[in-house]
Amino acid sequence: LELLLNGGFSPLTGFMTSADHGSVCADMRLADGTLWPIPITLDVPEATAEKLSTGGTLALRDDEGVMLAVLHAEDIWRPDREAEAQAVFGTTNREHPGVGQLLDRTEPVYVGGRLEGLQPVSHYDYKELRHTPTELRAAFTKLGWTKVVAFQTRNPMHRAHQELTLRAAKEVEANLLIHPVVGMTKPGDVDHYTRVRCYQALLPRYPQKTAMLSLLPLAMRMGGPREAVWHAIIRKNHGCTHLVVGRDHAGPGSDSNGNAFYGPYDAQELLSKHEAELGVTMVPFKLMVFVEETDSYTPIDEVPEGKRTLNLSGTELRDRLAKGKEVPSWFTFPTVAEELARSHPPRHEQGFTLLFTGLSGSGKSTIANVLLVKLLEMGGRAVTLLDGDLVRKNLSSELGFSREHRDINIRRIGYVASEITKNGGVAVCAPIAPFDSVRKQVRAMIEPLGGFMVVHVATPLEVCERRDRKGLYAKARAGIIKEFTGISDPYEAPEDAEIVIDTTTLTAEEAAQQIILHLEKEGYVAGKA
């Protein structure tokens, strides 16, 4: 919404109609032929769509209820989102974050039409670093910058990025705009507060008056080649003449089988076909690697034969940060490393969540209570138990046991657990949590904030039914209780559980001890220094 209102998405002046949407998906062009590679749509629930008709208006508000704009509805339709995913992302694999967002977290109805802005979107963070396209172009004019090369990033910048951007600016004799995305990025990315502090720590390493930092409120789609073209359009709207495009630009990496969603230089190839039409010049770069003998970064295709090189992938860096490990000095600058360390303490100081899942009577609550006591005995962190029955009583008393309501309940537990984890505490959650998709949503919610482990209490149904301390299975078999997991409702056993326990032959004490040992192995509990 913000970029539609401030001109960042020019020539768009509203959300796409079905004609523009279909044309963009099929041909990367609006219905009038203008190059545009990514659908910009407003998705709404069925209930909202039923109250709206073409020619009507829809108020668009922020999270606090402030009306930011009015949409004049010109088109209302139900898109084929599978077809959209295949056209835009080249896949329907939900492991692609853009596809997962589109297929699983997008409402079924799209509304297109012209926007009437009422007031700008409010931001309270880094106000001095946020510029509209008009403001940024005016700043360039005031500085006398006639050629500006933009650098798009969603990650902290390190030595390789600094060398790459310096080379790019020198190559085309342009000033440098570091233009990081601070909207939605890829799950697991470093939060934007930490990233901005890292950019600010890096900025003094550029020659004076040659580089500036501005934040872009863009939600990335991780769309690879198409997204590179989109980024070029957006940067042109912000007054830039060039765009750095590196290896796997805006790509999500690989799927769980190790297959890359896009080729390493697909984005460069697609943008090169359109840069003349766009009026933005691409500055292509290959992977930068560290050459030990020269203590410097060099494009991989320029490394002299026989020279030893070092490289740290984004995945390896995230793993080091998650475990609180030191980032090597050849990889980043000390000031950047300090900022990352502030936001990524060692694992034994991080918060974490244990999400128990299993059938009623499997032993979840008993183990969770024993574990709670053991963790409190160890000290060092605040520990909270979110037991299924207690949550139903205090947080979800109005909910039933339909799939929709079960998922809402688990998301509520996940939200509370995420806040506990973010603030360095331990959340021990013991619902039934029968459905895999919502467990994955909770994982995605918490993993960027700290540790997350699924504990599958895999006690067989016949054992749970034999115990039946509350008489629930007997009532379910008799039809007195409807929608009972394991009898009339399904239970989807997790395939991604970090810990699997069967209490058929284990006591609750023994099971809790297994979990403690796993936490010790993973570094979440440690002896006193």
Task: Give, region by region, the residue ranges found by the protein language model.
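Active-site cores that bind ATP or allylic diphosphates and position pyrophosphate for catalysis
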Residues: 1-348
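Glycine-rich phosphate-binding loop of ATP-dependent small-molecule kinases
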Residues: 17, 29, 139, 143, ...
